[in-house]
């Protein structure tokens, strides 16, 4: 199983967001399975701008071990055809995950994006949240501010 992680998952490497401890424990065990893009890393780096230097250094050391994948033509084509009410950046996240032949799961804490990923047949990984949290009705309570 390879897991694509969006920015809403990666910011859980910071101490403040909800479920950060759950994410960090899960990621410690599954780090080699994670794939990210430059977009995921940009979202994380944006969140790091107000954190202390020692936290930034720790997070950079963790994410430097992640595999960064490029945007393939197939990923861009998939992103362009996704019709789930997603932002263009969220569509790119999903397009990369859907087009990558080894990705079977999607790590996210963004309800709309998790819902779209599940609709496209990906297992949702959101340590600390209940299975199916992204479904309509529970989405508003569980969804953190969107990064995408």
Predicted feature residues:
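Short active-site oxyanion
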Residues: 1, 30-34, 64-67, 101-105
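Short, well-structured N-terminal submotif of metal-dependent ribonuclease cores
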Residues: 1-36, 48-60, 122, 132-136, ...
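Short beta-strand scaffold positions
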Residues: 5, 35-36, 70, 88-91, ...
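Alpha-helix capping/helix-boundary segments
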Residues: 9-10, 40, 75, 93, ...
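A general structural signal for well-ordered alpha-helical segments in protein cores
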Residues: 20, 41, 56-59, 76, ...
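Acidic, PIN/NYN-like endoribonuclease modules and their adjacent C-terminal/linker elements
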Residues: 37, 41, 98-148
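His/Asp/Glu-enriched, well-ordered alpha-helical/loop segment
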Residues: 44
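Acidic catalytic patch
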Residues: 64-87, 92-96, 116
């Amino acid at each position: 199983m390879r897991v694509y992680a969006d920015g809403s998952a990666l910011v859980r490497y910071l101490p403040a967001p909800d479920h950060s401890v759950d994410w960090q424990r899960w990621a410690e065990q599954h780090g080699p399975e994670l794939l990210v893009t430059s977009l995921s890393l940009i979202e994380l780096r944006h969140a790091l701008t107000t954190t202390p230097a020692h936290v930034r250094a720790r997070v950079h050391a963790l994410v430097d071990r992640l595999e960064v994948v490029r945007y393939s033509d197939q990923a861009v084509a998939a992103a362009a055809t996704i019709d789930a009410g997603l932002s263009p950046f969220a569509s790119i996240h999903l397009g990369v995950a859907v087009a990558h032949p080894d990705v079977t799961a999607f790590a996210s804490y963004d309800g709309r994006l998790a819902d779209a990923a599940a609709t496209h047949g990906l297992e949702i990984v959101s340590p600390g949240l209940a299975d199916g949290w992204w479904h309509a009705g529970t989405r508003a309570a569980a969804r953190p501010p969107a990064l995408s």
